[in-house]
Structure formats: C-alpha cells, structure tokens
Amino acid sequence: MTNGKYAARKLKKDRQQRRWSDSEYARRERGLGKKSDPLEGAPQGRGIVLEKVGIEAKQPNSAIRKCVRVQLIKNGKQVTAFCPGDGAISFIDEHDEVTIAGIGGAKGRAMGDLSGVNYKVEKVNGVSLIELVRGNAEKPVR
C-alpha cells in the first residue's frame, strides 16, 4: 500500500481491484443473481401447476409440507412453490394458473424447515389463496 499526499489514485485503484475478491460483490456486479433466478429478477411470476407434492420438513421438525410443482409461463422453467395456509392445497388443482412470489428466506433463499423451496403461491386463477382459505372468495371455474 502507498502512503503520502498524492497517493489517492493508487489507493482507489487498488481498492477497486481488491473488491473483486469479495464473492458477493463479484456476483452482484456480474448480475449472476438475475441470470440464475427463474423469475429473472421479477418480484412475481405466473405459471401452470404440473403436480402436487409433499415435501418433508428438515429435522428436528416432522411434517409433510404441501407444495406444488409449477412451470413458469415466461421461460418454461420448473420450480417448487409452497402453499401457505391450512388446507390451501385443496384449492389448487393441476393445470391451474398460479402466481408465485419469493418465500422470504434469508438472502432470497429457502425459509425455515423447507429446503429447496424458494417460492410460495399467492394467487390461484387470479384469486388470492389467503382469501380462498379464509372463505372470503370462491375459486372461478375456468
């Protein structure tokens, strides 16, 4: 490192070069998060339900979390989405159109005891899943 009255340019250049050693900085600058994200940086996405799946919770919990496999409309990628709410899975059928969003885990990843599930179902055929579970709305017949 250089010291001195006129060393600012060298210090700045060295700092800019060293930043690339930080993996988070490098990923952010190269846009790798958006590249690997099935939603391509969007907050929500629409998809078609392929199948219902039950995913076992990680230790020490013991449960089968109800999820669905969804094929996104925008790019054809398949993701697993969690169905929040008591009995929510009963309102979702195969070939329904669902809106999914991030599940809200740390650093945009999985949440709690659900490994590999980064998304949750928000709407089914344009109607909020929470409204369906509460009984405030009815699922439209397509």
From Swiss-Prot:
Matches recorded under InterPro entries: NA-bd_OB-fold, Ribosomal_uS12, Ribosomal_uS12_arc, Ribosomal_uS12_euk/arc
Q: Indicate what this protein is called per its UniProt record.
A: Small ribosomal subunit protein uS12
What keywords is this UniProt entry annotated with? Answer: Ribonucleoprotein, Ribosomal protein, RNA-binding, rRNA-binding
Output the PROSITE patterns linked to this UniProt entry.
RIBOSOMAL_S12
Question: Key word Secreted present in the record?
Answer: no
Q: Which Gene3D superfamilies match?
A: Nucleic acid-binding proteins
HAMAP family recorded: Ribosomal_uS12_A (MF_00403_A)
Q: What species is this protein from?
A: Halobacterium salinarum (strain ATCC 700922 / JCM 11081 / NRC-1) (Halobacterium halobium)
Q: How does it assemble?
A: Part of the 30S ribosomal subunit.
User: One GO term of the cellular component aspect?
Assistant: ribosome
Q: Which family does it belong to?
A: Belongs to the universal ribosomal protein uS12 family.
Q: List the disulfide bonds.
A: none
Any one GO molecular function term: structural constituent of ribosome
SUPFAM superfamilies this protein is in? Nucleic acid-binding proteins (SSF50249)
Q: Does the keyword Ribonucleoprotein apply?
A: yes
Question: One GO biological process from the UniProt record?
Answer: translation
Q: Which domain of life is it from?
A: Archaea
- Start-end of Basic residues biased regions: 7-16
Q: Where is region (Disordered) located?
A: 1-44
NCBIfam families attached to this UniProt entry: PRK04211.1, uS12_E_A
Question: Could you tell me what this protein does?
Answer: With S4 and S5 plays an important role in translational accuracy. Located at the interface of the 30S and 50S subunits.
Positions with biased composition (Basic and acidic residues): 17-38
